[in-house]
Amino acid sequence: MKHTDIRDCFEKEELVGSKLTVCGWVRTSRDSKNMAFLELNDGTTLKHLQIVIDKGSLTPDAEALKLGASLKVVGTLVNSRNNSVEVNAEEIVVLGKCPQDYPLQKKRHTLEFMRSMPHLRTRTNTFNAVLRVRSVMAEAIHDYFQSRGYVYVHTPLIT
């Protein structure tokens, strides 16, 4: 089964009630006796998709509940109480485990801290939002000049 972007789960009403597969990284997890809740993000949107795990029918691997783990979740997309959507998980596959010393946690990190880890910056909401704004601005600038007959030229680098 082909995976569905998390962005599409929020934007396409026709997906509600259907069985789908989503892949992403665990942003937060809450665990109780009978239920577990994960928030999954795949980078296609700033929103996080809540995954509901009924422990009576599905026992998640402990690795799946760790912040930063990469998962594939198969389940049914349903409307949630807060006018959003969530996935009732039927199957969870851990695609990538997260090391014990994973530096990103639930709390907000300073820009100084993130400067020391450029490979993880895009996993934060701040840098994700900055990249999206820059993308929209660059597209608008290119469209403006293209519509006026300008040609975009990649100049050679002089070293």
Stretches with model-predicted labels:
Residues 1-159:
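Class II aminoacyl-tRNA synthetase catalytic cores and aaRS-like
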